[in-house]
Amino acid sequence: LNFEIVIAIELYNFVTSKFGRNTLRYFIELAYKGTNYCGWQYQPDANSVQETLNKALSILLKKEIDVVGAGRTDTGVHAKQMYAHFDYDAAIDSQQLVHKLNSFLPKDIVVLNIIKVSDEAHARFDAKKRTYEYHIHTFKDVFENEGSWLHQLPLDVDK
C-alpha cells in the first residue's frame, strides 16, 4: 500500500509539473522602448522583448518562465502599456519582484505592476481593447525624430 501511495504522489507531481496544474497566474503590466528589439515575440537569432522578460523572470524565480503577451509589436515599435501573463508555482511578493525585475532588466523595459489573477485569465484572449497611436509631424523637428514619422507633404485627413 505504501508503494502505491508513493507512485500516486509521484504521478500527481509529474502531471502537475507538466500540465501547469497547481500553479498561480500573474499578469505583468510593462512598458518598453522597442528601438533595440525585433518586436515583442521571440524570434531565433534576434533580441525580443518577450525573450528578455522570460530570461529575467527565469533567473529571478529560479524556474523557466514563458510569458504570454496580450499582443505583438513589430520591430522598433514602443509600448506605453502592455500586458502579459505567466504561471508560477508559488505566491509572489509583487512589489519586491517588480523592484528586482526593474533592477535586472535593461533600461528600455520597465515593469509597472504584477497582479495575481485567476488561473483562467489570459492576457491575449481576455483583452477588451487595444489602442495604437501613430505619431507624425509635417516638418523636421530634432525633438520628434525618434518617436514619430516625418511626412512633409500636405496631409489628407479625409482620405
Q: Where is each model-derived feature located?
A:
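Structured-RNA-binding interfaces characteristic of tRNA pseudouridine synthases
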Residues: F19-K159
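A general, composition-driven signal for non-globular sequence regions
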Residues: Y12-V15, D66
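Intrinsic disorder
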Residues: F3, F14-S17
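Compositionally biased, low-complexity intrinsically disordered regions
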Residues: L1-E4, E10
